[in-house]
């Protein structure tokens, strides 16, 4: 179990019944299987019929079971339904923040993402432009060991509903699926209740203040530097999409560059606007953390409002 970027862990607050989380009817599945379909960890056998002691198969469903992946013997199977029940009932519900369900994804490899948007109980405003930023909660899991399990929090620009994932400014309570003695993930993960109450506003404040440092013009030389040093891990296709959106939006600032990137990565398919892949999330983090690092490295105290400066008018 790891608590990332969280140093102010306080005593847990007793959990009470809450209806602070609402679920929409607009839920997306990846393959037709229900996200809480039965899942089993089953032995794998050699051709001679003997059991492989090192490998187990994770299979979905009760009949005609679908193989999600092979895992080690020490793999701890965590059911999506149980994880959601704990995260919603013990963390989001008692947090005094109203969360509404946005998106749920589950594919045939057992990758699970469940996303909730927070209300205005906690929000921040980007300096100069005043854009409103709020929290996003994401419950994550996998049945093939490819991702950690738990809950993480990052940000959303309200104006365009772009999600902004960040390893540096976000916070999370996640763990691997490997058994560790008497480790009880249910007991550990509810520590995120006090994390959410104690650290959310300060994390959000730090994020929006650094977004404020992006309110400055960037030219082709700056973009070349950004591409070479800060977005060098972003695939070429996604960088091309980012630049196309950047020029279309005509917000020729570093903030405009970030918003163009998060827009094409959070809304990659106009026909299916909630269709997101693991690559969308990881590339989103590359854009957000890369450009915020650029902002920190190059900040000189000068900012501009692209909506009030002649050089940015169409």
Predicted regions and their residues:
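N-terminal low-complexity, intrinsically disordered segments
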Residues: 1-107
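Residues at beta-strand starts and edge strands
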Residues: 81, 109-111, 133
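Beta-rich nucleic-acid/ligand-interaction surfaces
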Residues: 98-122
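Intrinsically disordered, low-complexity regions enriched in serine/threonine
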Residues: 1-41, 103, 120-314
